[in-house]
């Protein structure tokens, strides 16, 4: 499963779940988003909290850690935590680990410019070999947008609340 495609599904599911009026559709979308978050945490790299370009093949030697999907997954998990529908401490830990690794290892700086590193360039539909052979780029807008969403939501979830969303 290609990371960024699934990342957008995670992010938009969480956003839609938040804005829908109470009722069956809100409940169904929320359940989908929560189920996806629970599944994604199982594929997260246990050491640094990143996700792979091909999410369900992290054990393959040629697969690589991709920042835009990690940002989108972290955004969705943080949104669900903020909504109060994902309240197990392991999800808070997963979000914090991913966020801190992105900040520490995947943000670059050069000539007063700040950018996101290790982003898969634009991608069409393909198989495993296609996805892992895609060019890796620094300062690609796919990463910048995903990072901005993640950082803003992380702040709203954990900082703006004064830590009240800590689980």
Where are these regions (language model features)?
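Alpha-helix N-cap and loop-to-helix initiation/capping positions
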Residues: 1, 24, 28-32, 65-68, ...
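Soluble or luminal CAZymes and related metallo-dependent hydrolases
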Residues: 1, 8, 32, 94, ...
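Alpha-helical bundle segments that constitute or directly flank the non-heme di-iron/ferroxidase center
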Residues: 1-11, 71-73, 147
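Solvent-exposed, flexible loop/coil residues
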Residues: 5-6, 55-59, 90, 120
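Oxyanion-binding "anion nests"
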Residues: 10-58, 62
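CBM-like carbohydrate-recognition segments
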Residues: 62-65, 69, 74-167
């Amino acid at each position: 499963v290609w990371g960024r495609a699934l990342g957008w599904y995670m992010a938009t599911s969480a956003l839609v779940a938040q804005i829908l009026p109470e009722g069956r559709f809100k409940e169904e979308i929320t359940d989908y988003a929560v189920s996806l978050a629970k599944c994604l945490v199982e594929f997260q790299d246990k050491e640094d909290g990143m996700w792979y370009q091909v999410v369900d093949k992290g054990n393959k030697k040629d697969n690589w850690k991709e920042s835009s999907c990690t940002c989108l997954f972290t955004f969705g998990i943080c949104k669900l935590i903020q909504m109060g529908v994902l309240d197990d401490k392991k999800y808070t830990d997963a979000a914090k680990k991913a966020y801190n690794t992105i900040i520490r290892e995947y943000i670059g700086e050069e000539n007063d410019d700040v950018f996101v590193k290790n982003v898969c360039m634009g991608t069409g539909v393909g198989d495993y070999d296609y996805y892992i052979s895609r060019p890796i780029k620094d300062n690609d807008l796919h990463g910048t947008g995903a990072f901005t969403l993640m950082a803003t939501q992380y702040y709203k979830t954990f900082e703006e609340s004064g830590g009240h969303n800590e689980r």
